Amino acid sequence: MAELLLVETPIPQQKHYESKPFPAVISPPSASIPIPALSLPLFTQTIKTQKHYLDSLLHESGAVLFRGFPVNSADDFNDVVEAFGFDELPYVGGAAPRTSVVGRVFTANESPPDQKIPFHHEMAQVREFPSKLFFYCEIEPKCGGETPIVLSHVVYERMKDKHPEFVQRLEEHGLLYVRVLGEDDDPSSPIGRGWKSTFLTHDKNLAEQRAVDLGMKLEWTEDGGAKTVMGPIPAIKYDESRNRKVWFNSMVAAYTGWEDKRNDPRKAVTFGDGKPLPADIVHDCLRILEEECVAVPWQRGDVLLIDNWAVLHSRRPFDPPRRVLASLCK
């Protein structure tokens, strides 16, 4: 089979760090290839043959957006994910309500469209988190609904410069995450995943064992729900592949977004010694995240590959319809 030429394409929303674009954007050569020849099998075959180049690009930039390729369905997206050859990571221990779609593909966080999902590294609050994640736009929103991304080491450096004592405390004590789960999923909440979905079982004994495997403490509540305590776990990690520290946590997400009828966000995350976080510094971190982020409006067929070690992501509110799918990789 012929191989497709991959073209690095500039878009207005990109930022540049050390002369490298963020995110990198890859498109087909629009002028040289007739549209009928631009098939999904050709795209997936090119991914396989150009894997070294794409891995290098992801390592340099932290995120790669594939735009203009014939990825028209969840099945197509699953084929794209499979073409990269990354091992699958089951979604066990995460907070977001999600629905399995096909193969390795499930819905992105299904919280209501008027709610913002704050910046976080995917599953930063558990031991086993994905190293990479894919997003795919099946239905582009009428308005809003971007998935802003931000380079984690940039956030770390800015926080260290502005709040050195706070960062030192984080490095010494880590963070403690507390979440109260219902028995079943609550689609009205951005963290509404019930314990049955969280641990992929209806058996409490098995749920307890899986919690232990994840490093969680699990307590059952009188209403049939559960309380999970995770940590202390590091809030700042060292990215060995890039030789730099990264702001690898869900601090802002938990403190500003883990709120529903069961959860108080101010109690959802604390220093690892249990002491409360200073609200003004948390909100200043949010400001830094917003200043440094890139928000590219989704287009139907877009596939976004994120290095979860390098990049935090979020979701902006939107006017429906919008359907963005996801896949996690070890």
Curated annotation (Swiss-Prot):
Which Pfam family name is an example for this entry? TauD
Q: Which residues bind Fe cation?
A: H120, E122, H313
Enzyme class, spelled out: oxidoreductase
The species is: Arabidopsis thaliana
MF terms (GO), sorted A to Z: metal ion binding; oxidoreductase activity
Question: Could you give one GO CC term from the UniProt record?
Answer: cytosol
A further note on this protein reads: May use 2-oxoglutarate as a cosubstrate.
User: What note does UniProt attach to the cofactor annotation?
Assistant: Binds 1 Fe cation per subunit.
According to UniProt, the name of this protein is Clavaminate synthase-like protein At3g21360
